[in-house]
Design a protein with these regions (language model features):
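A surface/secretory-pathway sequence property marking extracellular, secreted
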Residues: 21-74, 189-258, 385-446, 553-625
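Surface-exposed intrinsically disordered loops and tails
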Residues: 54, 78-82, 141-167, 219-245, ...
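Short beta-strand elements of extracellular/lumenal beta-sandwich folds
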Residues: 2-24, 161, 165-192, 363-389, ...
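Low-complexity, intrinsically disordered segments enriched in Ser/Thr together with acidic residues
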Residues: 6, 10-11, 67-109, 114, ...
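Long, low-complexity, polar and repeat-rich extracellular regions
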Residues: 19-22, 86, 116-117, 184-188, ...
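Beta-strand elements of well-folded, non-transmembrane domains
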Residues: 12-16, 31-33, 94-98, 115-119, ...
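One face of beta-strands
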Residues: 12, 43-45, 111-115, 179, ...
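Extracellular/luminal low-complexity Ser/Thr/Pro-rich, glycosylation-prone repeat/linker regions
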Residues: 1, 101-103, 107-162, 292-358, ...
Length: 684
């Protein structure tokens, strides 16, 4: 293995019974034929004579690819007429060079030596030795017929198994690191497989059950690359012979010592595979809505993403370490898919609407709206799993009363309405619908047959769900009426955008001021004492600032029930001023009857989009008391007020005269603003 250490020995002898002492003696190693792969350390040379360390009796040399020991004179002087040969052994340590072999490469090299007596040099034998480098690879994998379909990627194509496939949120996905063990290793002191999914953490969530992380082995055809494709189902589970460690996004499997010992001198190569099961978990659990935000998409948009928000691939890396050598794997990636899920609230035709978008528009209690749920996904051809379950869940507001019989589902590709299942009548249908009044939810489950025919990989299903509902008469004017739906594909839940309707908001007020005849109309006389014959002004602020309505405002005005025993008001004196101070009394109907002043916007010619007819605004209501107290409105047959009046406040000025006084009596006055069927009282 690269970076492994080793030692080489050269054996020789000092011959006995020589007629004269030797003039020189050398013993050495020449690694010229292996110099590309190894290096020897001069400082490590040790020489023994008959097993006894005699290094100090030699000079040590290194030149190029040669390392040798030459006898000193003191040793040479002992070589004359010895009784027997003396065994000489030179040992030198070395190391396999790093970065020389390619991953999976195995080479055979030889190493020579020599011994030299005076001028006679004798070469040694050249024993061969092999060097090998591991070659791991990795892939994303998926379930197939309920079993994990383990794969290999020996060419490191990043296109095997589930690599590059599109996953839905909640899908199951796994990762494998495939390593090999050579069959002719001389020593094995470490085998470690590592998987690091840091770059895929935005999408991938490792199983919380660490016992599901497994290691498998199988006899292999080669040690140059992975070769056992279905090792999870056909291999041997050896997880108990490894220590599994999870540190953040890094998972390591480190072999036990007894397992390492068994890998020396194997009969056949082995493949070992680390398996990590997990789940697709969009945006670290924050779901499709957060993914859309992270990629600057609008709520409800369709999105396929193979990168993190920072642009890096949703890739996974790994490595295999054998002894001191670590080789990295390839880095395959996977992708996520978010289907389009659109929601609209529509101005409904029976309310005089033109089916226009009514999102964020004002809707009054008692008015109807139409909701449309639309999805038109371009399903990827390489979805990791078939779509087998499709469900719509609409969560409507607690203050919406749905008109359940208006539910319709249409295949927009053909314009054909889908058929509701009715088993008692023998109608199989394309879907079933369930309304949960307590949870305010509508759930639509599509039939298996419909899903199989219309939601296949690579298809373009187009479905619209619509239903109508009425805003409750009890809806508070401080709460928006909202709606959202979610599309469920298999186990993936994708929310739509949220649509909302604003409640009507009107804040009328009233003040009591001096009359211009007796003083300054800007000076309040609220709470002051008045004398018989004194005059003043009741001024009511008619609040029509809110103008972004889903439907036409059909009634707007004020009703002021004043104390007619003590003050008198003439209808001819009443005037209405806009925010610029202009007199717009002519756009209002004014009546005073039985101590009550009525000031209401006139009805005008009103176009009804759905019928194409214009309803005349005249004649105006003859009895404003009856008009002001009437409930309900028929938008298709009754006129509305002039919508250009909306968007500002009006001052309704009602001059009065004191016609009776009683010592200590307080004259009180409060007005009511009526807008459509809503009422808002002023201060008193």
């Amino acid at each position: 293995m690269q970076r492994d250490t080793f030692a080489v020995t050269v054996n020789g002898k000092l011959p006995g019974n020589l007629a004269r002492k030797m003039t020189s003696y050398e013993i050495g190693d020449d690694f010229a034929k292996a110099a590309k792969y190894i290096d020897l350390d001069k400082a490590s040379v040790e020489v023994t004579i008959d097993g006894k360390d005699s290094t100090d009796r030699f000079d040590i040399h290194k030149e190029g690819t040669k390392v040798w020991a030459s006898a000193k004179k003191s040793l040479l002087d002992t070589t004359y007429n010895t009784a027997a040969d003396r065994a000489v052994r030179m040992t030198v340590e070395g190391a396999y060079l790093k970065g020389v072999l390619k991953a999976g490469e195995k080479v055979t090299m030889t190493n020579g030596g020599w011994e030299k007596w005076n001028d006679q040099e004798i070469p040694s034998n050249e024993p061969p030795v092999k060097e090998w480098s591991p070659n791991p690879d990795k892939s994303w994998i998926r379930l197939e017929n309920g079993k994990w379909e383990a794969v290999i990627d020996p060419s490191e194509s990043n296109k095997t198994g589930a690599d590059t496939m599109k996953f839905l949120d909640g899908d199951q996905v796994g990762s494998v690191v495939n390593g090999t063990i050579a069959n002719d290793l001389a020593k094995v002191n470490d085998i470690t497989l590592t998987d690091d999914y840091a770059n895929a953490d935005y999408l991938f969530d490792l199983t919380g059950d660490r016992s599901r992380i497994r290691v498998y082995e199988a006899d292999a055809a080669t040690d140059a690359k992975s070769s056992v494709a279905d090792i999870i189902n056909t291999g041997r589970d050896v997880t108990d012979r490894f220590d599994i460690t999870v540190n953040g996004t890094k998972v390591t499997a480190k072999a036990h010592a007894d397992y390492l010992a068994e890998q020396v001198g194997l009969k056949n190569p082995k493949q070992i595979t680390l398996f990590l099961p997990g789940t697709v978990d969009f945006a670290d659990g924050k779901g499709a809505a957060q993914v859309r935000k992270d990629f600057n998409k609008a709520a409800g948009d369709e999105l396929t993403f193979c990168e993190n928000p920072d642009g890096s691939k949703l890739a996974n890396s790994g490595s295999e370490k054998v002894n001191d050598e670590t080789q990295p794997t390839n880095e395959p990636y996977i992708c996520g898919y978010v289907p389009p899920v659109k929601k609209k609230v529509i101005a409904e035709g029976s309310q005089g609407g033109a089916n226009q978008d009514a999102n964020d528009k004002v809707v009054y209690p008692g008015q109807r709206v139409e909701y449309r749920l639309t999805t038109k996904p371009q399903l990827p051809a390489d979805l990791a799993y078939d779509v087998v379950h499709v469900r719509d869940t609409d969560t409507y507001d607690q203050y919406l009363i749905p008109d359940k019989q208006t539910l319709e589902i249409t295949d927009l590709a053909t314009g054909t309405p889908l058929v509701t299942a009715d088993p008692p009548m023998g109608v199989e249908g394309d879907y079933t619908a369930a309304w949960d009044d307590e949870s305010h939810e509508l759930t639509i489950a599509y039939s298996d047959k419909y899903v199989q025919e219309h939601w296949t990989k690579g298809s373009h299903p187009q479905v619209q769900v619509r239903f109508e509902g009425t805003v409750s008469e009890d809806a508070p004017t401080t709460v928006k009426v909202g709606n959202q739906w979610a599309l469920t594909l298999n186990g993936s839940v994708t929310p739509s955008n949220i649509v909302e309707n604003n409640p009507p908001k009107h804040d009328p007020s009233k003040k009591d001021t001096q009359s211009s005849a007796q003083g300054d109309p800007t000076v309040t006389i609220d709470g002051k004492t008045m004398l018989l014959g004194d005059t003043g002004n009741y001024t009511v602020t008619l609040d029509l600032k809110q103008k972004d309505n889903a439907y036409r405002v059909w009634r707007a005005g004020i009703t002021d029930d004043y104390d007619e025993q003590y003050v008198s008001i003439l209808p001819s004196d009443i005037e209405v001023l806009d925010q610029s101070g202009e007199d717009v009394t002519g756009r209002f109907n004014v009546q005073v009857r039985d101590g009550v002043a009525y000031v209401y916007a006139k009805t005008v010619d009103t176009f009804v989009p759905k019928t194409g007819r214009t309803i005349p605004g005249d004649p105006q209501p003859e009895d404003l008391a009856a008009y002001a107290s009437a409930s309900g409105h028929d938008p298709l047959n009754e006129p509305a007020i002039d919508q250009t009046l909306l968007g500002q406040e009006y001052q309704v000025v009602m001059p009065y005269k004191v016609v009776k006084v009683t010592d200590g009596y307080t004259v009180r006055n409060k007005a009511v603003q009526v807008t459509n069927d809503t009422k808002a009282e002023t201060n008193e």
